[in-house]
């Protein structure tokens, strides 16, 4: 019994440091919001302008790594001895489901507006050229390049899971081949894990900070309840309580059902927007944007705007590359878990094709709808953002569709379910990562899961109190910096170990 308690308890060296660090940062921020905003702007400017190039080179090098995996000596190596656990159709569907978070719904609807109003390459705002490049940049930021980088890490984790039979719940577990067992399980490994956890906590908090206003703005539209910070806090609190009830009452099956409902509802809502918004225009705009992407791809890959200093690559490309970096380990572990029995080539191709299709469908349909509403003068997005918040502008892009009440109910339910599953996943991932070994079929302790969901909720509220997108962007970029190095170490550790255990025959 004592041994069981020890196994299911927290791991102090990776539980308390992130808790203390995040708690202090939240306290300092709330203590003086104005001073915090000054610091946030300074951090954002420093990281993006001084180190933005490093994020761009990271993505490019990882892209070459994807080609090496697909066409190199390990392409036909199987990740585990068993047959694939899921059919190809189910496998692709689970990938799509992982893309339909409320944060994705946030960016998919509004991102194109920012690209058109503050375009790259010195283009005139709101010009024809800006509109032509707008969706192309969304396809770039959410296309094959970032998914190729994820596929490399997914192969690495699948290798450690199913070939080396390692129980990986923290990144330090994968570093034994690179730095040795003494360092991986010692102070160095603890530091790596703490970097990972602090960054992951802030990433999840930012996702909640993006998702919550969508729900509260839906409530204002549907029920006339004014959107305030207090309402945001109440909604987040309700989600945390709901998550605690689900965990305490063993309703995890219900959460999984909700996740499936979210996926099916996403298909339904996207199909509705595609049909009523203008299917012909959407397909034409997508086709044109793919051409623009191919035409400008070399420049997009290396674009830092060092001479023009317009700030577009720093504000968007570097931000999104940091977004991808910060979620890489968590997402890659999930994708590796569902890819047992597949070959390296199959995993790499499946991820890039399946996940690119998912994100391209989302961004094309939602972005095209926003552009049409702007061109037809149905929505004045700058005015909506100035007078209200960004989330209000997003809500209005949905409310402008036919059968607006039914559409808004569908969007409200989708955002609500997406956020419930987000908090559940956040608390589970953080609890698993900060507890001692949890056996297969066991759940991490209830209080630990609730505690982490509360902390993530607090971060979401703090970011909402700061206002605007810059605090959210800065939290992602600052968190992405340490994980930049962690991801590289995991990759190098895999390459070093695979040379020994996957020798060419």
From Swiss-Prot:
Report the subcellular localization. Cell inner membrane
Principal localisation: membrane
Indicate whether Acetylation appears among the record's keywords: no
Which transformation does this protein catalyse, written as a reaction?
Answer: 4-(trimethylamino)butanoate(in) + (R)-carnitine(out) = 4-(trimethylamino)butanoate(out) + (R)-carnitine(in)
Q: What is the topology of this protein in the membrane according to its UniProt annotation?
A: Multi-pass membrane protein
Q: Name one GO molecular function term.
A: (R)-carnitine:4-(trimethylammonio)butanoate antiporter activity
Q: In which pathway does it act?
A: Amine and polyamine metabolism; carnitine metabolism
Q: Which GO terms describe its cellular component?
A: plasma membrane
Q: Which UniProt keywords apply?
A: Antiport, Cell inner membrane, Cell membrane, Membrane, Transmembrane, Transmembrane helix, Transport
GO biological process assignments: 4-(trimethylammonio)butanoate transport; carnitine metabolic process
List the InterPro entries hit by this protein, alphabetically.
Answer: BCCT_CS, BCCT_transptr, BCCT_transptr_CaiT
Q: Where are the transmembrane segments?
A: 10-30, 51-71, 92-112, 143-163, 195-215, 231-251, 263-283, 316-336, 347-367, 403-423, 446-466, 475-495
Q: Does the keyword Metal-binding apply?
A: no
State the similarity comment: Belongs to the BCCT transporter (TC 2.A.15) family. CaiT subfamily.
Q: What does this protein do?
A: Catalyzes the exchange of L-carnitine for gamma-butyrobetaine.
Subunit structure, as described in the record: Homotrimer.
Task: Report the protein name in the record.
Answer: L-carnitine/gamma-butyrobetaine antiporter
- Give the taxonomic lineage as stored in the record: Bacteria, Pseudomonadati, Pseudomonadota, Gammaproteobacteria, Enterobacterales
- Gene name of the record: caiT
